């Protein structure tokens, strides 16, 4: 699945944001905990010297359900993030999965806790995220299995965000893991 999304920080009060988003179909609120892992022996599976993650392994717990995800980020010629290829499956036994991760030699990189308030319209999933220790974010995502012009899709997403008339940042071009790495100055020694 190709996920094409734009992530922006939101500076308005949550009540104003929610009031604006309530015109879309509300899908619910989910509390999530994401634990990211790195491999000390694989350069592609740990932050690079620019504190950027090209590939990551994530364990997500969402309302007592557990998912394992491997993400591969795709960048343009200037190093700007375009989209992620994501491979995800649900699993039942978190304790067994943690044993497998430990046996593989993977190490915990960071944990992100957030509350996701999700809406949908006919094209996008729109998520207001309250991220512990980071703030409020709006993620607008278009998912497809088809070959599409990523830059054109992102232009359309940006137009949609602009139409919301919220006080937001420019596109962040990094995910919450990278923001957390930078905020906490996490460095993985070789």
Predicted regions and their residues:
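Coil-to-beta-strand transition motifs
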Residues: 1, 133-136
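N-terminal strand-loop-strand beta-hairpin
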Residues: 1-123, 167-190
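C-terminal accessory/tail domains of diverse enzymes
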Residues: 62, 134, 146-148
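An amphipathic alpha-helical core segment
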Residues: 125-133, 143-145
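Mixed-charge, glycine-accented linear interaction segment located at domain edges/termini
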Residues: 146-175
């Amino acid at each position: 699945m190709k996920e094409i999304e734009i992530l922006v920080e939101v500076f308005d009060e949550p009540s104003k944001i929610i009031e604006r988003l309530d015109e879309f179909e509300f899908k619910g609120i989910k509390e999530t905990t994401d634990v990211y892992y790195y491999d000390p022996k694989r350069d592609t599976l740990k932050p690079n010297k620019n504190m950027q993650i090209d590939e990551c392994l994530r364990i997500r717990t969402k309302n007592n359900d557990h998912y394992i995800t491997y993400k591969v980020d795709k960048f343009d010629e200037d190093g700007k993030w375009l989209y992620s290829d994501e491979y995800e499956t649900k699993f039942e036994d978190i304790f067994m999965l943690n044993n497998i991760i430990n046996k593989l030699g993977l190490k915990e990189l960071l944990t992100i806790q957030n509350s996701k308030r999700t809406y949908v319209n006919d094209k996008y999933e729109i998520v207001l995220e309250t991220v512990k220790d980071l703030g409020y974010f709006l993620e607008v995502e278009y998912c497809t299995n088809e070959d599409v012009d990523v830059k054109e899709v992102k232009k359309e997403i940006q137009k949609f965000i602009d139409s919301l008339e919220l006080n937001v940042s420019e596109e962040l071009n990094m995910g919450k893991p990278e923001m957390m790495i930078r905020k906490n100055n996490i460095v993985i020694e070789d």
